Amino acid sequence: MNPWSSYLLGWTTFLLYFYETSGKIPNLSSLGKHEFTKPWISIKEDQKDSCVFPFVYKGSSYFSCIKTNSFSPWCATRAVYNGQWKFCMADDYPRCIFPFIFRGKSHNSCITEGSFLRRLWCSVTSSFDENQQWKYCETNEYGGNSFSKPCIFPSIFRNSTIFECMEDENNKLWCPTTENMDEDGKWSLCADTRISSLVPGFPCHFPFSYKNKNYYNCIGKGTKENLTWCATSYNYDRDHTWVYC
C-alpha cells in the first residue's frame, strides 16, 4: 500500500468513527489542535456523583452521555455544567424511550437504521428527530450486584410475583436474577432489547419534568380525578402543555 492510500484509509476510518459517535460528518476545517481538548481542563473528575439528565453544556441540553471535545463519553453531574463531570459507564446512560420517532416513523424497539456499523441503538427521548439524543442498546443484562446475570421471571419481590422489569427511584429498569429476590437480593439492569413500548407515544414527551423531577411514564399527580397524564414538551413547569394518557 502506497503512502497516499494509507493516508486516505486513515481519514476514511476517522470520518466513519466520528460520524458513528457524533451523528454527523465533522467540519474538517475546524479540527485544529484544540478541537479535542477536554472541556474540564484543570477541573477534577467527580466519579462519586451520578450523571444528571438532561444537563446543560454550553447552552445546549443533553439527555445522554456525549463525546463533545472528548474521545470518551462523559456527562455532567450537575443540571448545569459547572466543571463537575464523570466518564460514562454502561449503567450511567439513561434508559431507552419506546416508542420513539426517527425520520418520521415510530419505533417500539432498538433499531439499526441509520447506523453505519449496524449496531442497535435507541433514542433517549420520545423524538430523535427533535432532540438527536441517543445511545447504543445493551443487548444483555448489565450492572447490578449479580455480575450481569440475566433476568429470571417469574420471581418473588416483596412477597409478590413479578414477570417484568421494574423501575427504581432513579428511573432505571432492573430485574431479579434469581427466582426469589426477597431471599437472594440479586439483580441486574435490564437489557435495552428486553424492553418494548412501556408508555404512550406521540404526543407525550418522555422524559418530562414536573415540579423539577423527571418522569418516564404517565402520572396521576396533580389531578383530582386520578386520571393519568403526560407533558407534551420536556418542561411542563415552563410550557404547561399536556394530554391525558
UniProtKB/Swiss-Prot annotation:
PANTHER family: SEMINAL PLASMA PROTEIN, SEMINAL PLASMA PROTEIN HSP-1. This is Epididymal sperm-binding protein 1. PROSITE patterns: FN2_1 (PS00023), FN2_2 (PS51092). The keyword Disulfide bond applies. The keyword DNA repair does not apply. It holds the Pfam family fn2. The lineage of its organism: Eukaryota, Metazoa, Chordata, Craniata, Vertebrata. Detected in epididymal duct epithelium, cauda epididymidal fluid and on sperm membrane (at protein level).
